[in-house]
Amino acid sequence: MSRKYFEEEVIQQTLDYNYAQHSDADKFNIAYGIDKNFLFGCGVSIASVLLANPEKALAFHVFTDFFDSEDQQRFEALAKQYATQIVVYLIDCERLKSLPSTKNWTYATYFRFIIADYFSDKTDRVLYLDADIACKGSIQELIDLNFAENEIAAVVAEGELEWWTKRSVSLATPGLVSGYFNAGFILINIPLWTAENISKKAIEMLKDPEVVQRITHLDQDVLNIFLVNKARFVDKKFNTQFSLNYELKDSVINPVDAETVFVHYIGPTKPWHSWGAYPVSQYFLQAKSNSPWSHCALLNPVTSHQLRYAAKHMFNQKHYTSGINYYIAYFKRKLLE
């Protein structure tokens, strides 16, 4: 019986931009699962990993449901620029659209299950990263990591004991008091993930109406349930989370330091947004300037949600005229909704 939930038929097309000098056997595989709104971020995220890890044998895998000719040109140029391999997989999303989604999480969040299943007979380990992550340090420690017998993944804890306790109660999983992780960074032990049938179990749970009522973080909650006591918690430097909307608070503590490897820009405001100009965005912007996206403008607000945040950030940055204009645009947009 197949241990995969997703067979390879969900992949409609594969584009392989291979300019690497290394053999496939030597490569450390890094994967992203995104929709069209994160292609910009994904390209720059890949550039940041390559910029911080020159000479390493890496291969990047982008699973998406949208990829136009402009994207093709830029991603191929990126692979060529850094003499690396980038493989793009066009996904048929029909089976995912019935699963729960929110304003901030679309069905693309479930691509990580397709990723794990795709690699089930191809490699032992895959590093899954969210596309809003920028790299600023060496990933050699992850390349060298050896899993213990029962470890399905390596992850980074989110929050502290109080948050873990709340999640353990909400999700009826007492073991979560020992740690609840953010699913934006997962180093997957592919053979054990496959043997434990994680993708299939997770998708089935996400179809259960009773479970859907309890969960607030979709597949992240479900993965925490299935990986309890079966995941290795690694240092927070591998998933240092910061929301650019924290900059709107009176007091801001920036957790990024010299040891940080991955900066994870959580929340709705991203460093590729024109209103996200803060010092902590520098890791994204540096990679952008060293990529085929170097001449691309940062994205302006489109939705009412974005216009409201753009207005707040413009006032926070003392760009008052822009702030007023964004508020006017926000109220006009709200009238049309």
From Swiss-Prot:
It catalyses: UDP-alpha-D-galactose + [lipopolysaccharide] = UDP + 3-alpha-D-galactosyl-[lipopolysaccharide]. Pathway: Bacterial outer membrane biogenesis; LPS core biosynthesis. InterPro entries: Glyco_trans_8 (IPR002495), Glyco_transf_8N (IPR013645), Glycosyltrans_8_dom-fam (IPR050748), Nucleotide-diphossugar_trans (IPR029044). Inhibited in a competitive manner by closely related nonsubstrate lipopolysaccharides. This is Lipopolysaccharide 1,3-galactosyltransferase. Pfam families: Glyco_transf_8, Glyco_transf_8C. A motif (DXD 1) lies at residues 130-132. Optimum pH is 8.5-9.0. Transmembrane segments: none annotated. A motif (DXD 2) lies at residues 219-221. Galactosyltransferase involved in the biosynthesis of the core oligosaccharide region of lipopolysaccharide (LPS). Catalyzes the addition of an alpha l,3-linked galactose (galactose I) to the first outer-core glucose (glucose I). Cannot use UDP-glucose. Activity probably does not require the branched galactose added by WaaB, but it is higher in the presence of this branched galactose. UDP binds at residues 33-38, 130-131, 264-270. Keywords: Glycosyltransferase, Lipopolysaccharide biosynthesis, Magnesium, Metal-binding, Transferase. It comes from Salmonella typhimurium (strain LT2 / SGSC1412 / ATCC 700720). The keyword Transferase applies. GO terms for biological process: lipopolysaccharide core region biosynthetic process. Belongs to the glycosyltransferase 8 family. Can also use Ca(2+) or Mn(2+), with lower efficiency. Mg(2+) binds at residues 130, 132, 264. Disruption phenotype: The mutant has no detectable galactosyltransferase I activity. Mutant synthesizes truncated outer core region, does not express the O antigen and cannot invade epithelial cells. LPS contains one galactose and one glucose unit. Its cofactor is Mg(2+). CDD domains: GT8_A4GalT_like. Its EC number is 2.4.1.44. It comes from the Bacteria.
